[in-house]
């Protein structure tokens, strides 16, 4: 049952990519910086970390806006080497670091973990999950990497590439249940949660 006057909807993020994704659902919403502590806990694995951070971001904003539904999200890229050892890849921040990250991704599989939590009234969680997307990079030479970074400058993206842009040309394959997850917000399962909360979609 859809609500005639649904409560406010807030995206607990300052990411323009997540904002653009949520705009696809054509719902009225606002954005707030979550201000949550993102320090990893000792021994915390990547999947547990992104789930906790998504929940913490949503809860931090919900504490300030108790009547609103709040969406929190977090993403991490994890590189798998030939022995199966995991290493995390953050947002490169600089051109040199971006080039180094893509060099380390060449010919390898990168797992993107995208967590979502939808909460209301100071942490009363309605819905939370972690989407897993596997990206297999083709073998990349130095010139290809440098051209890509110069053209797209994906310095604020986990893993140092944008699948929605030229980054798709670096891929050999992408295995995902939700193509929007890799960009930063899995809309298929998020829209299901929002429908459960009473938002009219479509």
Residue ranges of model-derived segments:
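N-terminal beta1-alpha1 ligand-phosphate binding loop
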Residues: 2-27
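Anionic-ligand binding patches
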Residues: 3-9, 43-202
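Cofactor-binding loop segments of dinucleotide-utilizing enzymes, especially the Rossmann-like FAD-
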Residues: 14, 34, 121
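Flexible, glycine-rich phosphate/dinucleotide-binding loops
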Residues: 18, 38-40, 125
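Short loop/helix-cap segments at secondary-structure boundaries that form the rim of catalytic
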Residues: 20-24, 41, 63-64
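A generic short alpha-helical patch detector that favors 3-5-residue windows
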Residues: 27-28, 162
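Residue-level detector of anion-binding/catalytic polar loops
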Residues: 28-30, 200
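A short beta-strand-loop structural module common to alpha/beta enzyme folds
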Residues: 30-38
């Amino acid at each position: 049952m859809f609500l005639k006057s649904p409560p406010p909807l807030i995206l607990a993020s300052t990411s323009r990519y997540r904002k653009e994704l949520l705009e696809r659902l054509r719902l009225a919403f606002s954005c707030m910086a979550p201000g949550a502590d993102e320090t990893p806990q000792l021994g915390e694995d990547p999947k547990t970390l992104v789930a906790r951070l998504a929940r913490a971001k949503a809860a931090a904003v919900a504490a300030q806006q108790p009547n609103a539904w709040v969406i929190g999200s977090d993403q991490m890229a994890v590189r798998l080497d030939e022995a199966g050892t995991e290493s995390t890849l953050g947002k490169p921040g600089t051109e040199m670091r971006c080039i180094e990250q893509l060099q380390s991704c060449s010919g390898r599989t990168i797992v993107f973990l995208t967590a979502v939590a939808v909460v209301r009234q100071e942490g009363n969680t309605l819905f939370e999950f972690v989407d897993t997307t596997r990206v297999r990079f083709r073998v990349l030479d130095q010139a290809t990497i440098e051209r890509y970074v110069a053209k797209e400058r994906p310095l604020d993206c986990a893993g140092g590439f944008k699948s929605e842009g030229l980054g798709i040309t670096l891929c050999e394959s992408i295995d995902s249940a939700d193509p929007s997850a890799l960009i930063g917000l899995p809309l298929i399962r998020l829209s299901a949660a929002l429908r459960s909360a009473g938002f009219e979609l479509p």
